[in-house]
């Protein structure tokens, strides 16, 4: 198995001479709410049945996100494009953006939770990825499989990364693989984030966070503790915490 992985890596690394080093990725992020609810053991049976009845067996919500990247860093945020599901929704989008500076090894993030805005500033941490012996095509790129566990949200996350785009970036709060993350599968399909288009793009100001951001500044440890406490509160109430925080 190890020899197979080595051969695959050698083949993919040979493509780096012509690798894309700069551009924009368009992702489709699909949340399957009924399946997501089934991953939450603390929801009462009545609550699960009620939500399944209301939403149907295949209730899903699509949204689009963008990742700007180059060798220096990346920036992940909402897209202005609306999905079919959100056509009738005219409310404002929450502030959301994740900037990673690979040269300075820093993370800057803005997000909203329970009506409040938070700004996360910290160093980039090493993520505990396990690279597996599987490959598949995503948006025309041969990708390798990796896995990681989110111990706070109780998630098994599968990532597919393209070694022919040797940028250690990705969607959501995930990065740190030897290639751009093209797809995420969270908890066996409760949420799928999939790259649908990659465009060459000269990066200028696209990776800058909005100016004059206002919010409470916290570090990564405080962020994780806040998410952990919020989930614990919702567990006690037998409610789904992911109506308010990203799954």
What do these predicted ranges mean?
Residues 20-247:
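Extended soluble regions of mature proteins
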Residues 1-25, 244-247:
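Bacterial Sec-dependent N-terminal signal peptides
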């Amino acid at each position: 198995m190890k020899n197979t992985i080595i051969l695959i890596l050698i083949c993919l690394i040979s493509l780096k001479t012509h690798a894309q080093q700069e551009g924009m990725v368009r992702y489709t992020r699909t949340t399957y709410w009924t399946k997501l609810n089934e991953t939450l053991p603390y929801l009462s049976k009545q609550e699960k049945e009620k939500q399944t009845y209301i939403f149907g067996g295949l209730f899903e919500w699509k949204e689009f996100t963008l990742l700007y990247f180059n060798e220096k860093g990346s920036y992940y945020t909402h897209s202005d494009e609306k999905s079919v599901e959100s056509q009738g929704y005219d409310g404002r989008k929450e502030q959301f953006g994740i900037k990673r500076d690979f040269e300075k090894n820093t993370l800057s993030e803005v997000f909203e939770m329970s009506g409040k805005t938070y700004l996360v500033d910290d160093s980039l941490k090493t993520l505990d990825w396990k690279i597996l012996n599987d490959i598949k095509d995503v948006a025309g790129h041969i990708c390798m499989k990796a896995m990681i566990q989110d111990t706070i949200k109780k998630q098994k996350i599968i990532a597919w990364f393209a070694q022919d785009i040797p940028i250690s970036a990705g969607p959501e709060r995930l990065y740190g693989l030897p290639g751009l993350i093209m797809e995420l599968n969270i908890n066996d399909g409760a949420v799928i984030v999939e790259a649908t288009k990659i465009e060459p793009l000269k990066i200028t100001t696209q990776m800058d966070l909005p100016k004059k951001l206002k919010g409470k500044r916290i570090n990564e440890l405080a962020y994780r503790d806040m998410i952990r406490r919020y989930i614990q509160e919702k567990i006690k109430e037998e409610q789904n915490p992911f109506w308010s925080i990203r799954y």
